[in-house]
């Protein structure tokens, strides 16, 4: 029934290497565009919820705590799915898996729309459909990473993955425009248009994506990327292959027993409190506390994503200039985040609000990218998916969930850790950023030792 998700591996064509290399580009670009556009579209049917919050409050009388409960459902299933669904997808045709999951997620969001009537809602159905949507979206990043890794040479993989990484920034930045167009032009200003229109787009993108590309050049008889581009298999990968380690053995040895991965997991928890805390509540804070218009509030949300796009491209490059010191560069960004949060909290006018959100997007997505890049440096290629999965699971189950429900309760006036109101919300954001700095500083020390150790080995080999 789901045979289209199985991997296809054809015998290598009896053609010269340079001919097969020329044949590589077209199917690669098809596959690359499918995962890029597919992941971008996932954000259109995820971030529209953030855009619609003020209208859901005014139309249906939902409280911030209830909105937080809906978001919590997504966070839990997304977090669990990051490990479970990604583990299942490993060994499947990941290029096909992503658009299939996009289609299922879009169907769930249509169900979410149906749970909102003319003037009433079913909170249970809203939580259920949004949670299912999160479960299906959870493997989007892992499938994209797996597909691109199988297609590209190591020396250019960072460029391709770095550019792919802006897909979710573009999706987040475009979510407001797509959602508002659906509501204002297709549904006479009703909030359900913010969910139905993006879902229809996602269905179209998903079905088209199933028709183009595949997860590896081996699907076309072109051979492995290493063979096509004259690269040796890395030492870490050779070790796992020579020992014939199973996926579970690799997961235990290189992830569960890896203290750096655990430090990065907890760093990611704190970072997600900051990132999702800003992302989830910026429009509500601007409208309720700063007394700005809904239009300006949404502009700030969009600028946060635009700043993230720029930051995603720049911070990785800066860490390369620092000779791979990802954690150290992340600490610099985190220190700047704390200072900028103060400006955002006390924004005196809309221009300060907009500028501070752009700056926060630029800064927050630097450490998010660098935590992932740092993790890659401490595991073999076969463990990257597992490391990314467990890191994401912790971030969403704890960090994302607290940012949505915990911060929502604090803003509503419910004491959490002795914090109440918007002042308490910002105190929690500051504390999370400080916690992330402390953990990343520990990673920076271990990263420095690794860099110096590898440098000595390289000097010995040259001598």
Curated annotation (Swiss-Prot):
Residues on the membrane's Cytoplasmic side span 1-24, 82-96, 144-159, 211-259, 319-326, 379-382, 447-463
Q: Which UniProt keywords apply?
A: Cell inner membrane, Cell membrane, Membrane, Phosphate transport, Sugar transport, Transmembrane, Transmembrane helix, Transport
| Gene Ontology MF terms in the entry | glucose 6-phosphate:phosphate antiporter activity
Induction, as annotated? External glucose-6-phosphate induces the expression of the UHP-region.
Matching entries from Gene3D superfamilies are given as: MFS general substrate transporter like domains
- Keyword Ion transport tagged: no
Q: Name one Pfam family in it.
A: MFS_1
A GO BP entry is: glucose-6-phosphate transport
Q: Which domain of life is it from?
A: Bacteria
State the similarity comment. Belongs to the major facilitator superfamily. Organophosphate:Pi antiporter (OPA) (TC 2.A.1.4) family.
Protein role: Mediates the exchange of external hexose 6-phosphate and internal inorganic phosphate.
Q: What is this protein called?
A: Hexose-6-phosphate:phosphate antiporter
């Amino acid at each position: 029934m789901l045979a289209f998700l199985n991997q296809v591996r054809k015998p290598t064509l009896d053609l010269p290497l340079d001919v097969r290399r020329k044949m590589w580009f077209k199917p690669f670009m098809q596959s690359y565009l499918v995962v890029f556009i597919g992941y971008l579209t996932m954000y259109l049917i995820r971030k529209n919820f953030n855009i619609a919050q003020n209208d859901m409050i005014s139309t249906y009388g939902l409280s911030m705590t209830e909105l937080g409960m809906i978001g919590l459902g997504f966070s839990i299933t997304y977090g669990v799915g990051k490990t479970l669904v990604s583990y299942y997808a490993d060994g499947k045709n990941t290029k096909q898996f992503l658009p299939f999951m996009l289609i299922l997620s879009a169907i769930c969001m249509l169900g979410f729309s149906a749970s909102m009537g003319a003037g009433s809602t079913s909170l249970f159905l809203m939580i259920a459909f949004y949670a299912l949507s999160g479960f299906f979206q959870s493997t989007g990043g892992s499938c994209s990473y797996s597909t691109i890794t199988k297609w590209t040479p190591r020396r250019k993989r960072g460029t391709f993955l770095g550019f792919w990484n802006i897909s979710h920034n573009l999706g987040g930045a475009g979510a407001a425009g797509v959602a508002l167009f659906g509501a204002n032009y297709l549904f006479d200003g009703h909030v359900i248009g913010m969910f139905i229109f993006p879902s229809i787009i996602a269905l179209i993108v998903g079905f088209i994506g199933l028709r183009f590309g595949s997860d590896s050049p081996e699907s076309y008889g072109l051979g492995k990327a290493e063979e096509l581009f004259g690269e040796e298999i890395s030492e870490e990968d050779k070790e796992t292959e020579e020992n014939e380690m199973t996926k579970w053995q690799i997961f235990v040895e290189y992830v569960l027993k890896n203290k750096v991965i655990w430090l990065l997991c907890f760093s990611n928890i704190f970072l997600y409190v900051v990132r999702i805390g800003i992302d989830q509540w910026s429009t509500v804070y601007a409208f309720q506390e700063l007394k700005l218009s809904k239009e300006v509030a949404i502009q700030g949300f969009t600028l946060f994503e635009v700043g993230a796009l720029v930051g995603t491209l720049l911070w990785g490059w800066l860490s390369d200039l620092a000779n791979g010191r990802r954690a150290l560069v992340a600490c610099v960004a985190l220190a700047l985040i704390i200072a900028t949060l103060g400006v955002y909290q006390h924004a005196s006018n809309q221009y300060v609000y907009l500028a501070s959100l752009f700056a926060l997007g630029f800064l927050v997505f630097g450490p998010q990218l660098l935590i992932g890049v740092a993790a890659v440096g401490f595991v073999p290629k076969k463990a990257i998916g597992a490391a990314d999965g467990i890191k994401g699971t912790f971030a969403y189950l704890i960090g994302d969930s607290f940012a949505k429900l915990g911060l929502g309760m604090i803003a509503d006036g419910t004491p959490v850790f002795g914090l109440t109101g918007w002042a308490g919300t910002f105190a929690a954001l500051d504390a999370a950023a400080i916690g992330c700095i402390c953990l990343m500083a520990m990673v920076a020390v271990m990263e420095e030792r690794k860099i110096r150790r590898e440098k000595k080995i390289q000097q010995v080999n040259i001598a």
